[in-house]
Amino acid sequence: MTGVSDIQEAVAQIKAAGPSKPRLARDPVNQPMINNWVEAIGDRNPIYVDDAAARAAGHPGIVAPPAMIQVWTMMGLGGVRPKDDPLGPIIKLFDDAGYIGVVATNCEQTYHRYLLPGEQVSISAELGDVVGPKQTALGEGWFINQHIVWQVGDEDVAEMNWRILKFKPAGSPSSVPDDLDPDAMMRPSSSRDTAFFWDGVKAHELRIQRLADGSLRHPPVPAVWQDKSVPINYVVSSGRGTVFSFVVHHAPKVPGRTVPFVIALVELEEGVRMLGELRGADPARVAIGMPVRATYIDFPDWSLYAWEPDE
């Protein structure tokens, strides 16, 4: 599963499952763990270790540092992530699609109250927005948002919004189809008027030019109605459409391509028509009206869009 549409559909299925069931921490909030944590961090606030100091500060006794919230629900070295935890399937989805790199980008925690020794914390997680693909300094990637809630009983005591980036490391070998030779193929010609489109293809987006009157146009035309320093206005297509017309090319040979191959004129959901190769379909089974979707082929130095059956 490598197509953008495939990934989006799989993400939607994971998201539709909703939050995971609350999972209880292995141990209650406890003083030994608090002692170890504050010593390791160097936090000398006495309310975490001295009962009298905590009561003087208005607490019923010693309290746990709020920043320890993740500590209480760690699974340990031998822990197994629950099947309904969305992080497991979402990581596997992107690993299988070649996005093997991972880095945390944002973490925002909210603490609703202090925890007390003896309280048993539970955790649940829910998948948020998944945005991509985006070109980053690390490589092409997807930003994955997750919302996590900690509870004591039915009371929310803390929550966290965090985001990770799953990416294909920049410079990693591209998976080039066997029937294509990028060194021999004719590369797309990009100009000031079409650069936005090919930049979109590189980012795995089909960008359609929007004219001054709001209508959509493809192929792009020079935007003579605006100053040349103003970026081209466009919308991002869903990438879905139907075959409006097609041809099966048998001869002559085309540099970098293996014959026969199918060239299809696709009418996109947005109403414009776009030409490209239809891949992954038996030429004998291609028909007008056939549902297709955009897919992208990343060569070492450039990218190309194509169509594939939308089954």
Swiss-Prot record:
InterPro entries documented for this protein: ChsH2_C, FAS1-like_DH_region, HotDog_dom_sf, NA-bd_OB-fold
Top EC class of this enzyme: lyase
Domain notes: The DUF35 C-terminal region is not required for hydratase activity. This region is involved in interaction with LtpA and is required for optimal LtpA aldolase activity.
Protein's recorded name: 3-oxo-4,17-pregnadiene-20-carboxyl-CoA hydratase alpha subunit
Reactions catalysed: 3-oxochola-4,17-dien-22-oyl-CoA + H2O = 17-hydroxy-3-oxochol-4-en-22-oyl-CoA; (2E)-octenoyl-CoA + H2O = 3-hydroxyoctanoyl-CoA; (2E)-decenoyl-CoA + H2O = 3-hydroxydecanoyl-CoA
Pfam families per UniProt: FAS1_DH_region (PF13452), OB_ChsH2_C (PF01796)
Entry's transmembrane regions: none
UniProt source species: Mycobacterium tuberculosis (strain ATCC 25618 / H37Rv)
Family statement drawn from the similarity comment of this UniProt entry: Belongs to the thioester dehydratase family.
Cell inner membrane keyword on record: no
Mechanisms controlling activity: In the absence of the Ltp2 aldolase, ChsH1/ChsH2 can hydrate only about 30% of the 3-OPDC-CoA substrate. Complete turnover requires the presence of Ltp2.
Function: Involved in cholesterol side chain degradation. Catalyzes the hydration of 3-oxo-4,17-pregnadiene-20-carboxyl-CoA (3-OPDC-CoA) to form 17-hydroxy-3-oxo-4-pregnene-20-carboxyl-CoA (17-HOPC-CoA), in the modified beta-oxidation pathway for cholesterol side chain degradation. Can also use octenoyl-CoA and decenoyl-CoA, with lower efficiency.
Location of region: DUF35: 198-295
The gene coding this protein: chsH2
